[in-house]
Amino acid sequence: MFEQLNQPGLFGITNSNRDFTKKEAWGKNQFNNAFPIALACFMFSQNIKPIYIRLEKRNIEHNYFAVDQVFQINPLEAQAFFAFEHSYHPYTELIIGKTPAIDVVISNLQNSQIINAFEIKLTAIPDNTTANLPDNLQGCEIVIRPDTIVYLALSIAKVFQQNPLALLDILDPVCARIGDWEDATSIQPMIPLFCELLYTIFDRYQAVQIPILLQPIWKTQGKLSILHENCLDLFVWSNFALAKVFLDASIKPSEKSITRPERTTVWLIKMLYDFAQNGKIDYKRTLDRITFNLKNDKAFAASGMVTRKYMNSPELQNPRIKRHSIKHIIINGGQRYLSPERRLDSAIVSTPGLFEEIL
């Protein structure tokens, strides 16, 4: 549509709750979750499949997974609708209170069916911890917010919606021993047991793990704000694989205070245990009360030194989308709406010749 009308836009995002012909649709948060969807649509048009990170017998496994399989709809069809920063209503019946917003909810306009929802993390490679290392050792930092863990819990609870007792049978032998979930002293020794409980769930229900997080990467020339020639690619995390990141950081508890990954493990167990007992998740109560004196601005963060072992692949070292393709993703002058003070925007604006036509 944008191509036909010669108006600013993003590739493939024809129907959405944003108007990309207007500058206000290109703000910081808007660009960070809309550009990745346009990237996914462009990759689909080029028959380039994202890397799907999933769990296989407690180990990370990579597969190639087409965008229409991830989204469960052809993203370029007229009926595909993208609602950004929206609640995912299929989880409403599993939760007490309002379902938190997620980065994108995908629906089918033809039958009004809500199809899927994803968190999105647009990440730069290399990050500060790996910028001085060779390409094969570089990685990108990922920061996970608490609401992502809520959606992770809901995605697992949904599996047990018709049979919550199956979940209770797994969790109750350990969780019933907890007298005070807010007491760090009594909770900390239990965290390795919580990790094992979650792995038990993942082992038994491995076949039903689902994509939950889209992680586009954009590569720069070292620490410079100039895009690498091979600059863009897309990784998709399953809910179980994402959980493994904080479980790996929790399975050997810290000797001092509870860490963010450990608290995230406790959050997930508590929400699932509440669901197993009551059929509902009171996520606000869990997040607000189980703090262990840590701020709630994020669930946890993992540096490039950590994430590379989960993401290590030819695509991480050499992303498949060339930088000259960006002019086919940001179209009809949309780059003029970008804010150069932000890092990806700055790299796009600062990279010479990016939007010039190749003769």
From Swiss-Prot:
Organism: Herpetosiphon aurantiacus (Herpetosiphon giganteus)
InterPro entries named in the record: Restrct_endonuc_II_HindVP (IPR019044)
Keywords on record: Endonuclease, Hydrolase, Nuclease, Restriction system
EC number, as in UniProt: 3.1.21.4
GO biological process, one term: DNA restriction-modification system
Presence of keyword Cytoplasm: no
Reactions performed catalytically: Endonucleolytic cleavage of DNA to give specific double-stranded fragments with terminal 5'-phosphates
One Pfam entry name: RE_HindVP
Full protein name: Type II restriction enzyme HgiDI
GO molecular function, one term: DNA binding
